[in-house]
A protein has these predicted regions:
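Bergerat-fold GHKL ATPase/HATPase_c domain
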Residues: 5-65, 69
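Glycine/threonine-rich ATP-lid/beta-loop region of ATP-binding domains
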Residues: 118-246
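Short loop/turn elements that form and flank the Walker-type P-loop nucleotide-binding site
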Residues: 40, 53-57, 70-73, 82-84, ...
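Conserved beta-strand-loop-beta-strand hairpin that lines the nucleotide-binding pocket
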Residues: 17-24, 59-121, 134
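Conserved protein kinase catalytic domain
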Residues: 44, 48, 102-106, 184
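Low-complexity, disordered terminal segments
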Residues: 1-2
């Protein structure tokens, strides 16, 4: 017989709900008789974000696809503690224009399409405008970027709603680096689950990177993991430059 369907975040989500119920009891909150109420905007954002980014692998997938959409010929994946402390994807693509930076991590903001009919002409991976917004909600998100027309780069840090909390000049080459620190930090149970499964999560991330490297063989990929004791593990390095991919 086929195994019943199971979703990766199901167990942590159940545990989160159990904790919520416990807090209600200990805080002395009374039952309101089942009255239907509007969910707060903050709660909706956190719930939806948890479905877009379910693990480190899905976060990495979204960031690699953003880099490919930017026309990158080089993509560097940098991890700290197998991605538990930090996941960073840097590329040498076209960068994020100044006019687009304020909305780059806002929900349903995208440079890929404006109207539904644009889907017929879409030639990119991402288009929903949800990934970066979800990462801003689930982690500490920062982006450094520069276009060929910029005199200098910019380092953007984001609030939980995806708005730019701070922007500062930074020296860097043309391209973009997206840093995701402390993924699932606002969700203690999910965070502990990630820490316990760090090695398996790393294997899945590496397999994802290898898949894109095989398909997009014109792009040079590297994946480096930095350990707590100062060790540095080069997990993947490809030559790129082949004509068949991309």
């Amino acid at each position: 017989a086929a195994e019943p369907y199971s979703s990766t975040p199901a167990r942590p989500l159940v545990m989160e709900l159990a904790q919520f119920a416990k807090r209600q009891r200990t805080d002395g909150l009374e039952d309101d008789g089942g009255r239907v109420q509007r969910i707060s905007a903050q709660a909706v954002q956190r719930i939806c974000s948890d479905q877009v980014i379910i693990d480190l692998q899905s976060a990495l997938k979204e960031l690699i696809e953003n880099a490919l959409d930017a026309g990158a010929s080089k993509i560097d994946v940098r991890l700290k503690e197998h991605g538990v402390e930090l996941l960073e994807v840097a590329d040498n693509g076209k960068g994020i224009p100044v006019a687009s930076r304020a909305g780059v991590a806002l929900r349903h903001h995208t440079s890929k399409l404006e109207e539904f009919d644009d889907l017929q002409r879409l030639r990119s991976f991402g288009f929903r405008g949800e990934a970066l917004n979800s990462l801003a909600t689930l982690a500490t998100l920062s982006i450094s970027t520069r276009t060929k027309d910029d005199a200098t780069g910019a380092l953007l840090t984001f609030a939980a709603d995806g708005g730019v909390a701070k922007s500062a000049p930074v020296a860097r080459d043309t391209g973009t680096a997206v840093s995701v620190a402390q993924l699932f930090g606002p969700f203690p149970v999910r965070r502990r689950e990630l820490q316990r499964n760090a090695t398996n999560e790393f294997r899945k991330m590496l397999a994802t990177t290898q898949t894109y490297a095989i398909i997009c063989d014109a792009v040079r990929f590297t994946c480096v993991n930095q350990l707590a004791k100062g060790g540095r593990q080069v997990a993947l390095q490809t030559e790129g430059g082949r004509g068949g991919g991309g």
